[in-house]
Swiss-Prot record:
Transcriptional coactivator of the p300/CBP-mediated transcription complex. Acts as a bridge, linking TFAP2 transcription factors and the p300/CBP transcriptional coactivator complex in order to stimulate TFAP2-mediated transcriptional activation. Positively regulates TGF-beta signaling through its association with the SMAD/p300/CBP-mediated transcriptional coactivator complex. Stimulates the peroxisome proliferator-activated receptors PPARA transcriptional activity. Enhances estrogen-dependent transactivation mediated by estrogen receptors. This is Cbp/p300-interacting transactivator 2. Keywords: Activator, Developmental protein, Differentiation, Nucleus, Repressor, Transcription, Transcription regulation. The keyword Transcription regulation applies. The gene is CITED2. GO terms for molecular function: chromatin binding; histone acetyltransferase binding; LBD domain binding; RNA polymerase II-specific DNA-binding transcription factor binding; SMAD binding; transcription coactivator activity; transcription corepressor activity. GO terms for biological process: adrenal cortex formation; bone morphogenesis; cardiac neural crest cell development involved in heart development; cell population proliferation; cellular response to hypoxia; central nervous system development; cranial nerve morphogenesis; decidualization. Disulfide bonds: none annotated. Residues 165-200 have a biased composition (Gly residues). A motif (Nuclear export signal) lies at residue 1. Interacts (via C-terminus) with SMAD2. Interacts (via C-terminus) with SMAD3 (via MH2 domain). Interacts with LHX2 (via LIM domains). Interacts with WT1. Interacts (via C-terminus) with EP300 (via CH1 domain); the interaction is stimulated in response to hypoxia. Interacts with PPARA. Interacts (via C-terminus) with TFAP2A, TFAP2B and TFAP2C. The lineage of its organism: Eukaryota, Metazoa, Chordata, Craniata, Vertebrata. It is found in: Nucleus. Residues 138-205 are annotated as: Disordered.
Amino acid sequence: MADHMMAMNHGRFPDGTNGLHHHPAHRMGMGQFPSPHHHQQQQPQHAFNALMGEHIHYGASNMNASSGIRHAMGPGTVNGGHPPSALAPAARFNNSQFMGPPVASQGGSLPASMQLQKLNNQYFNHHPYPHNHYMPDLHPAAGHQMNGTNQHFRDCNPKHSGGSSTPGGSGGSSTPGGSAGTSGGGAGSSNSGGGSGGGSSSNMPASVAHVPAAVLPPNVIDTDFIDEEVLMSLVIEMGLDRIKELPELWLGQNEFDFMTDFVCKQQPSRVSC
């Protein structure tokens, strides 16, 4: 291995006869510049090495491995065994395509953050404020919340707004900055100041952000209460009214034991030996 490195160093460094190639940093090519003369000679070759280094890298290594010749083998292998792109690591990385990804990542972080912001706005539109689009119909005075801090939430999904046609309006208002106009739904009408946006003619506090589920329209999925008659019919059909314990308590046991106990409790007149 040492002979191989020495032979490559004789072909690599032009000042190999003055003993500089015996230095470990110069021998391995680990320094930023192996020597001043070597840097001056390799400086015009940086463009060639950056362009042709990746294409000749494997070819030069294979030729050297097969033929055993460690010196120059053509215009592409002027460094004698090393691929032309195998300069000092700092010199190679500063003049090749390796500087591209950091710059691209800095430029690409902005669209990625914008996409995340868009997704976050859509997420927060549905989860922390799930009933904002029903508030203008139920509580007209609470419609000013759509104009304040939650303006961008309403702008993300305009279909949830109360029917405004201009930016800044909510409920039924048609003027920019209006807090809440006349809203339908049997909730009455209230005209509050457009400049302040905090005027309220309702007794309900304006800071209420969540409307109770009981006052929401019945078509909301959260307010689809199960009918007691339907529930009792299911209980009677399954025979749950004839047993003393619910079947959920038996789910941790074996399926066979559960089925036998369940059948025995459903048929109390059955004689079991």
